[in-house]
Amino acid sequence: MTKNPSQFVGDELPVDQVSWEDAMDFCKKLTAQEKAADRLPEGYEYTLPTEAQWEYACRAETTTSLNNGKNVTTVADERICDNLDEVGWYWMNGGKENWNARKDSAFGTLSALCTHPVGQKKPNNWGLYDMHGNVAEWCLDWAGEYPTSSVTDPVGPDASTERIHRGGSWFYGPRYCRSADRSTGKPAERTLNVGFRLALTPVK
């Protein structure tokens, strides 16, 4: 738990270059550490949020595509989206001046396009920062189709080949940073635009 695997290292930067497996291993170690120190509520553990829990926390009772009550609305927003700029880091405010360079460059080669210190953008109604952009965040669920009927707190399919991550990142355009957007990755996959956020939940 002492090694930071991130490509972009700083005390206030989100972790990146962590797989789903890495994140779950961290959660298990943190749970054991906090339990041993008697700092963990009885019957609770640290884990990743389910996809449903993540979106619920991101939206904070909003119904718009962004959690500031605004939307990603136009084709022009695929480049510059002022509504998203209020709450998240994405590929244009992560280095707008390098747009043409970004189009012609390989993934991860632009120093101006990177993670940013957390807490610089506006939080949502529940005080959560960086739910849009910066790094995408692993969720507990296997990837699968949404349920066809109403379900409370769904947990995804029992098995698949990929896990969900949500929120978009500094490398994504606005449409991929919406509250509802979802993407996937192999459980062992590590990339410089995906990290994770902890959830404290009852042990199941």
Report residues per predicted region.
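Generic detector of low-complexity/intrinsically disordered segments
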Residues: K3, A32, T50, L200-P202
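Short, P/G- and charge-enriched loop/turn segments at secondary-structure junctions
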Residues: R182-P187
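A generic structural micro-feature
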Residues: A159, A188-R190
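Short, structured beta-strand segments at or near domain termini in extracellular proteins/domains
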Residues: T191-K204
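Short, conserved catalytic-motif segment at the N-terminal edge
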Residues: M1-D11
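Functional-site microenvironments in short loops/helix caps that host divalent-cation chemistry
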Residues: V9, P14-D181
